[in-house]
Amino acid sequence: MRIAVVSDTHLSAPSDWLERAYAQHLATADAVIHCGDMTGRSAWSYFLQHPCFHCVQGNMDDYQLAVDLPPRLDLELEGLKVAVCHGWGYKAGLSRRIYEAFGPDYDIIFFGHTHAREDSQFGKTRCINPGSLREGSLAIVTLDAGKISTEFVTL
Protein backbone atom coordinates (compact mmCIF):
# COMPACT_ATOMS: atom_id res chain seq x y z
CA MET A 1 0.00 0.00 0.00
CA ARG A 2 1.33 3.40 -1.01
CA ILE A 3 0.19 6.33 1.18
CA ALA A 4 0.75 10.00 0.37
CA VAL A 5 1.03 11.87 3.68
CA VAL A 6 0.75 15.66 3.72
CA SER A 7 0.25 18.39 6.30
CA ASP A 8 0.17 22.13 6.77
CA THR A 9 -1.19 23.10 3.36
CA HIS A 10 -2.32 26.51 4.63
CA LEU A 11 -4.54 27.25 1.64
CA SER A 12 -8.03 28.68 1.51
CA ALA A 13 -8.48 27.40 -2.06
CA PRO A 14 -6.60 25.11 -4.47
CA SER A 15 -3.59 26.63 -6.21
CA ASP A 16 -1.53 25.71 -9.28
CA TRP A 17 1.20 24.16 -7.15
CA LEU A 18 -1.33 22.10 -5.19
CA GLU A 19 -2.86 20.78 -8.41
CA ARG A 20 0.61 19.83 -9.71
CA ALA A 21 1.54 18.11 -6.44
CA TYR A 22 -1.76 16.24 -6.45
CA ALA A 23 -1.34 15.05 -10.04
CA GLN A 24 2.31 14.03 -9.59
CA HIS A 25 2.23 12.41 -6.15
CA LEU A 26 -1.21 12.07 -4.57
CA ALA A 27 -3.55 10.93 -7.34
CA THR A 28 -1.76 7.60 -7.78
CA ALA A 29 -1.50 6.82 -4.05
CA ASP A 30 -3.73 4.15 -2.54
CA ALA A 31 -4.59 6.58 0.27
CA VAL A 32 -3.99 10.25 1.07
CA ILE A 33 -3.65 11.34 4.69
CA HIS A 34 -3.66 15.03 5.65
CA CYS A 35 -2.36 15.82 9.15
CA GLY A 36 -4.20 19.12 9.57
CA ASP A 37 -3.88 22.82 8.83
CA MET A 38 -5.60 22.47 5.50
CA THR A 39 -6.96 25.92 6.48
CA GLY A 40 -9.90 26.41 4.08
CA ARG A 41 -12.94 24.38 3.05
CA SER A 42 -12.32 24.92 -0.66
CA ALA A 43 -8.83 23.38 -0.42
CA TRP A 44 -10.27 20.50 1.63
CA SER A 45 -12.96 19.92 -1.02
CA TYR A 46 -10.25 19.61 -3.66
CA PHE A 47 -8.67 16.67 -1.79
CA LEU A 48 -12.04 14.90 -1.59
CA GLN A 49 -11.61 13.78 -5.19
CA HIS A 50 -9.29 11.05 -3.89
CA PRO A 51 -11.32 7.90 -3.15
CA CYS A 52 -9.40 7.17 0.08
CA PHE A 53 -8.79 10.57 1.71
CA HIS A 54 -8.42 11.04 5.47
CA CYS A 55 -7.95 14.41 7.21
CA VAL A 56 -7.79 15.74 10.77
CA GLN A 57 -8.23 19.28 12.03
CA GLY A 58 -5.26 21.52 12.68
CA ASN A 59 -4.83 24.57 14.87
CA MET A 60 -5.01 26.97 11.88
CA ASP A 61 -8.09 25.54 10.14
CA ASP A 62 -10.96 27.97 9.85
CA TYR A 63 -13.88 27.23 12.16
CA GLN A 64 -16.26 26.20 9.37
CA LEU A 65 -13.83 23.48 8.32
CA ALA A 66 -12.52 22.46 11.74
CA VAL A 67 -15.97 21.59 13.10
CA ASP A 68 -16.32 18.96 10.36
CA LEU A 69 -12.92 17.36 10.94
CA PRO A 70 -11.94 15.05 13.80
CA PRO A 71 -9.01 16.04 16.03
CA ARG A 72 -7.56 12.56 15.51
CA LEU A 73 -8.13 9.42 13.50
CA ASP A 74 -7.52 5.77 14.24
CA LEU A 75 -7.11 3.61 11.14
CA GLU A 76 -6.11 0.09 10.27
CA LEU A 77 -4.03 -0.03 7.10
CA GLU A 78 -2.54 -3.28 5.80
CA GLY A 79 -3.03 -4.80 9.24
CA LEU A 80 -1.14 -1.98 10.99
CA LYS A 81 -2.64 0.24 13.68
CA VAL A 82 -2.31 3.86 12.53
CA ALA A 83 -3.14 7.16 14.26
CA VAL A 84 -3.33 10.60 12.69
CA CYS A 85 -3.25 13.95 14.51
CA HIS A 86 -1.99 17.46 13.88
CA GLY A 87 0.15 18.20 16.91
CA TRP A 88 0.26 20.91 19.54
CA GLY A 89 2.55 23.17 21.49
CA TYR A 90 6.25 23.65 21.00
CA LYS A 91 8.08 21.99 18.14
CA ALA A 92 10.91 20.58 20.24
CA GLY A 93 10.06 17.10 21.48
CA LEU A 94 6.66 16.98 19.78
CA SER A 95 7.01 13.46 18.39
CA ARG A 96 7.80 12.07 21.84
CA ARG A 97 4.86 13.96 23.40
CA ILE A 98 2.55 12.59 20.71
CA TYR A 99 3.86 9.06 21.25
CA GLU A 100 3.35 9.38 25.01
CA ALA A 101 -0.18 10.76 24.53
CA PHE A 102 -1.24 8.00 22.13
CA GLY A 103 0.55 5.12 23.83
CA PRO A 104 2.70 2.28 22.53
CA ASP A 105 -0.02 0.25 20.78
CA TYR A 106 0.28 2.04 17.42
CA ASP A 107 2.53 0.95 14.59
CA ILE A 108 2.51 4.42 12.98
CA ILE A 109 1.49 7.89 14.14
CA PHE A 110 1.30 10.52 11.40
CA PHE A 111 1.45 14.14 12.58
CA GLY A 112 2.20 17.67 11.38
CA HIS A 113 2.31 21.11 13.05
CA THR A 114 6.09 21.65 13.05
CA HIS A 115 6.53 21.99 9.26
CA ALA A 116 9.62 19.78 9.68
CA ARG A 117 10.14 16.31 8.22
CA GLU A 118 10.61 13.60 10.78
CA ASP A 119 10.67 9.82 10.94
CA SER A 120 11.35 8.77 14.54
CA GLN A 121 10.85 5.49 16.33
CA PHE A 122 9.78 4.96 19.94
CA GLY A 123 9.57 1.29 20.80
CA LYS A 124 7.68 -0.30 17.91
CA THR A 125 5.94 2.97 16.95
CA ARG A 126 7.05 5.08 13.99
CA CYS A 127 6.20 8.79 14.31
CA ILE A 128 6.20 10.35 10.83
CA ASN A 129 5.81 14.03 9.97
CA PRO A 130 5.72 14.79 6.22
CA GLY A 131 6.74 18.43 6.67
CA SER A 132 4.67 21.25 5.20
CA LEU A 133 3.08 20.79 1.79
CA ARG A 134 2.92 24.59 1.52
CA GLU A 135 6.71 24.64 1.92
CA GLY A 136 7.18 21.88 -0.68
CA SER A 137 7.37 18.69 1.37
CA LEU A 138 5.37 15.47 1.55
CA ALA A 139 5.99 11.84 2.43
CA ILE A 140 5.27 8.66 0.52
CA VAL A 141 4.89 5.83 3.02
CA THR A 142 4.83 2.29 1.71
CA LEU A 143 3.37 -0.56 3.75
CA ASP A 144 4.40 -4.00 2.57
CA ALA A 145 3.94 -7.18 4.62
CA GLY A 146 4.29 -5.29 7.91
CA LYS A 147 7.31 -3.29 6.75
CA ILE A 148 7.12 0.50 6.74
CA SER A 149 9.27 2.58 4.40
CA THR A 150 9.24 6.36 4.16
CA GLU A 151 10.37 8.51 1.25
CA PHE A 152 10.34 12.28 1.70
CA VAL A 153 9.58 14.20 -1.49
CA THR A 154 10.65 17.77 -2.19
CA LEU A 155 8.40 19.58 -4.66
Predicted regions mapped to residue ranges:
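Active-site neighborhood of phospho(di)ester-bond hydrolases with catalytic His/Asp-centered motifs
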Residues: 5-7, 31-37, 54-59, 84-86, ...
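Binuclear metal-dependent phosphoesterase catalytic core
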Residues: 6, 77-78, 101-106, 121-122, ...
